[in-house]
Swiss-Prot record:
The chain crosses the membrane at residues 634-654. One of its GO terms (cellular component) is membrane. This is Maintenance of telomere capping protein 6. Residues 655-685 are cytoplasmic. The lineage of its organism: Eukaryota, Fungi, Dikarya, Ascomycota, Saccharomycotina. It is a single-pass type I membrane protein. Residues 310-324 have a biased composition (Basic and acidic residues). Residues 201-221, 238-295, 309-328 are annotated as: Disordered. May be involved in telomere capping. Residues 244-290 have a biased composition (Low complexity). Belongs to the MTC6 family. Keywords: Glycoprotein, Membrane, Signal, Transmembrane, Transmembrane helix.
């Protein structure tokens, strides 16, 4: 009998072990009732840490905002995404030199949120290799020792190191890809190459010797550090770091072949003879179609090679049945694949394209280049990356910035264009304000100018999102903005998003707003809902949207602009179609939207888990889960096992403790028998 009683408890304890060892996510943390405070404010002790700037890198707030914007754009073709770009020559190399330290600073731009880098590469026709330094190295230059060289075209003095090669840059880029190769941080990087011809230095070898001695003393520690970091880069590229449960890793075959690829490319890109004079010239063939010196071979055989999305991949995806590419009308064999497909299925991370081609002397574009690097030429009837005019300027850009309804008349033509880019110049520089405006209007700006005094890349990157407004998604809210009816019940949940004229804001899910609705699959056709509801009621079938419309959210910058313009045009008493015969007056309702319909709900929330913004209604689940360390799991399992062992020991001891035999049991039975005899068996008189 004791075992029958203990058996259910044993099963219960066994079932509790997995619960004890798993770290429960912070689900519905913000849905708890808010305690009233005397200062009538909701203060988050982590508020300052949430918004604190980080460099290189992003604040916790920017990380959450960038991830949310990336996630809602997963089902968008890659040519419709906005890329934050920077030209490395004016922003990095002019300041830090063409050195290994300069390459590390370039990777810092990617950590801060940049997704497009412009790199100048110079063809040395005499030595037959590509280099990052714009000037030919003198014969007396030693690898690892920076030298000062003067350019002929601009007369600028540049600092160059022979160890800072194109292969080294690609290895550093591969290391960044490995570090961010997880579901939380993965993104698509665009590497735009500008093909130039190397210049002959102005100064003589004797002056170069003096400058070399001047630099040698100060550069020794930097060279040693750079060499050790290069070794770590190459080692890190062989084993992919796992940072989340959805981490990606290269296949074993790719990892095993990378070492030989890197060594071959390094040897092939450097054929310089230290005994030859820098001023000597040689005649070489003007066109190459094969060989290790080809730019495509250098890029393809580098450590980043297995993570490239190439023209050959695009051709294969377009020729598939059905095609895996999309244009503005849907499936098309002339479009581009979705971001989700490239990042999560193909596990590709980098696209290399030619932004500017100065036709370097002695170098011809060959088949090896065309298979790896995208060009501006048309391919299979469609445009390749960067196949738009540099310095593109919309005639209606001001209409977009002003949220002018006239912009909707041309937005479909604008959305049909691929790879919409804008590159600044020193004469027409990009500032913090214009950077934000270009991104909001669906352009991918590239900074090709030095920043003005008072402007920093960190300040510029805080204005680099088309989705969230400034300082959003915020954890610092004031309870005074909560509606009166919500204050009476204390129901506050800052886990839902609304659309405002300046972008997305975090709002209380229990507030009532009109929902934002989209017409079918039409990207730029939006409408305001027909009734005010709290966010949780958007999942109910209450006809909250006009017929043919559903509750949704913008997934691109142009969709966001179209939604803003639509909502801004709704105010006062408005006739809204509710279904039926369009000629019947009874098929319309009159809704009073007041002075403005803003704010409106969008299909975005972090209800399932804090800081994890997902679409799909209030019941949508976060696709990421918290990964805890092995030591924590062992500790929790030890505690659970100890509790189970203690309970089991107690059960065994109770079973062994049987009822003792009473020695006077016979006497007790005799007393009970005599007592029964003395009782009457009938009713007494």
């Amino acid at each position: 009998m004791v075992w029958l009683w203990t058996l259910p408890w044993t099963f219960i304890l066994v079932a509790l072990i997995p619960l004890a060892t798993a770290k429960s996510p912070d689900v519905h943390h913000s849905l708890q009732q808010l305690k009233k405070r005397d200062d009538d404010s909701l203060r988050d002790e982590n508020c300052q840490a949430w918004i604190a700037p980080v460099w290189p890198g992003m604040s916790h707030m920017m990380v959450a905002a960038t991830r949310a914007e990336r996630d809602v754009s997963y089902n968008v073709s890659i040519d419709q995404l906005t890329y934050k770009g920077a030209e490395l020559t004016p922003l990095v190399f002019n300041k830090y030199g063409y050195t290994q330290d300069g390459i590390f600073k370039s990777m810092d731009l990617l950590k801060s949120g940049m997704t497009s880098l412009g790199l100048d590469v110079y063809w040395n026709n005499k030595e037959q290799y590509w280099q990052l330094c714009p000037v030919i190295f003198p014969s007396s230059a030693e690898p690892g020792t920076p030298v000062l060289l003067q350019r002929r075209l601009t007369t600028d003095i540049v600092t160059c190191d022979q160890n800072a090669t194109l292969s080294y840059f690609l290895a550093a880029l591969s290391n960044h890809v490995n570090v961010t190769d997880n579901n939380l941080d993965v993104d698509l990087i665009s590497l735009k190459l500008n093909l130039r011809t190397v210049e002959t230095p102005i100064q003589s070898n004797s002056s170069s010797q003096r400058q070399k001695r001047q630099f040698r003393e100060t550069s020794t520690s930097v060279t040693q550090l750079a060499s050790s970091v290069l070794s770590s880069l190459l080692n890190a590229s062989k084993t992919t770091r796992m940072e989340s449960t959805g981490s990606f890793s290269n296949s074993d075959s790719n990892s095993s072949s990378n070492s030989s690829r890197m060594s071959n490319s390094t040897e092939s890109t450097r054929t310089t003879s230290s005994t030859e004079s820098a001023s000597s010239t040689s005649t070489t063939p003007s066109t190459y179609t094969t060989g290790p010196q080809m730019l495509g071979n250098i890029v393809g055989s580098s450590y980043i090679g297995p993570r490239l999305y190439t023209p050959k991949d695009l051709h294969r995806d377009r020729e598939a049945e059905p095609p895996r590419t999309y244009d503005y009308q849907g499936l098309s064999n002339r479009g581009f694949p979705l971001a989700h497909y490239i990042l999560l299925e193909m596990k590709a991370r980098v696209m290399v394209s030619i932004s500017q081609n100065d036709q370097p002397d002695g170098y011809g574009w060959g088949s090896a280049d065309q298979d790896v690097i995208f060009t501006k030429q048309a391919l299979l009837g469609s445009s390749d990356p960067e196949n738009t005019n540099e310095n593109i300027a919309y005639e209606n850009l001001q209409e977009c910035i002003r949220l002018d309804p006239q912009f909707l008349q041309s937005i479909n033509l604008t959305g049909a264009a691929s790879w919409r880019t804008y590159s600044s110049t020193q004469q027409d520089p990009i500032s913090n304000v214009s950077f934000q405006e270009f991104i909001n209007c669906g352009l991918s700006p590239s900074i090709n100018n030095t920043l003005a005094p008072g402007e920093t890349l960190q300040g510029l990157m805080t204005e680099s999102l088309w989705s969230w407004a400034e300082d959003e998604p915020s954890k610092c809210h004031n309870e005074s903005v909560t509606r009166t009816q919500d204050r009476n019940t204390g129901l506050v949940a800052w886990n839902c998003a609304v659309l405002m004229p300046d972008g997305w804001h975090v709002a209380n899910c229990y507030d009532t707003h009109y929902p934002l609705c989209r017409q079918g699959e039409l990207a730029y056709n939006w409408a305001v809902g027909t009734q005010k509801v709290n966010y949780f009621d958007t999942a109910q079938e209450k006809n909250i949207c006009p017929p043919g419309y559903t509750f949704s959210l913008p997934r691109t910058a142009l969709q966001n602009i179209a939604a803003k313009i639509t909502v801004r045009g709704v105010s006062g008493k408005t006739r809204v179609y509710k279904g039926g015969d369009t000629t019947d007056p009874d098929s319309y309702d009159t809704i009073d939207y007041g002075n403005t319909a803003f704010p409106v709900w969008i299909d975005l929330n972090s209800i399932s888990q804090e800081d994890c913004w997902v679409s799909g209604g209030p019941t949508a689940r976060c696709p990421y889960r918290t990964v805890q360390s092995h030591s924590v799991s062992v500790a929790l399992l030890t505690v659970a096992s100890a509790v189970c062992a203690g309970v089991a020991a107690a059960i065994i001891l109770l079973q062994m403790d049987t009822q003792p035999i009473k020695k006077n049991s016979g006497r007790w039975r005799r007393l009970m028998s005599n007592f029964k005899k003395s009782e009457y068996e009938s009713v007494p008189a």
